[in-house]
Amino acid sequence: MFKDKFKISNIPTILWGEKSEKIFIAVHGNMSNKEDAVIKILAKEAIKKGYQVLSFDLPEHGERKNESTPCKVQYCVSDLSVIVNYVKEHWKEVSLFACSMGAYFSLLAYKNNMIKKALFLSPVVNMEKIIENMMMWFNITPERLKKEFTIETPIGQKLYWDYYCYVKENPINKWSIDTNILYGAKDELCEFEIINYFAQKYCCELEVMDTGEHYFHTKEQLDVFQQWLQKHIA
């Protein structure tokens, strides 16, 4: 498989596949990177259908692990905007694949973009609920978060006051892109009710894997993911 590694405005990027007029932007999830297993599978399936794939590292991930820029929503949305602007200059038809929090950043960054199709794996569609769940689990009040600004949780995730404020001030209220969602019934991060509400509100096709988790990583889960891609990449 042809792979070209380069940087777009200092964002480490991989372009997968031979030259084409069609491309998927691939946005990875938390604790992942631009060469994650699901992105490799996406590239394999998309290339078969005549697409290229552009994947990149979010702040604090992959080649950017040691960067000073934190993986905060405002920086990630900015990076996604840089990527889509580059892509629109070089390709005629743009589609989107996003996983977990990568889907959330995409919902914010790409709501006004001309994207033909979106494929979401285990998408985060309500970040405010996830942050508030974490605050509840670890007995962190909004007042304490505001005072301390940054709090490290026992599960290794940092909570930021400015991140929380951004999320509250920028709700997901627009999404008109033709979207397919693959969700695991055993997802411990995103409740089914929230995903289902989003899917119905924005007319997305939702497929649920009974033995799927938030992180698709077993052979069975990745096989289902691959079959789902084969069905929905036209």
Segments predicted by a language model, with ranges:
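The serine-hydrolase catalytic nucleophile loop
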Residues: 31-43, 193
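Conserved alpha/beta-hydrolase
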Residues: 38-39, 43-65
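Short beta-to-alpha linker loops that shape the active-site pocket of alpha/beta-hydrolase fold enzymes
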Residues: 30, 57-67, 124, 212
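Gly/Ala-rich beta-loop-alpha elbow adjacent to hydrolase catalytic centers
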Residues: 98-106
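Active-site glycine-rich loops that stabilize anionic/oxyanionic intermediates
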Residues: 21, 28-33
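The alpha/beta-hydrolase serine catalytic core
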Residues: 113-197, 201-208, 212-234
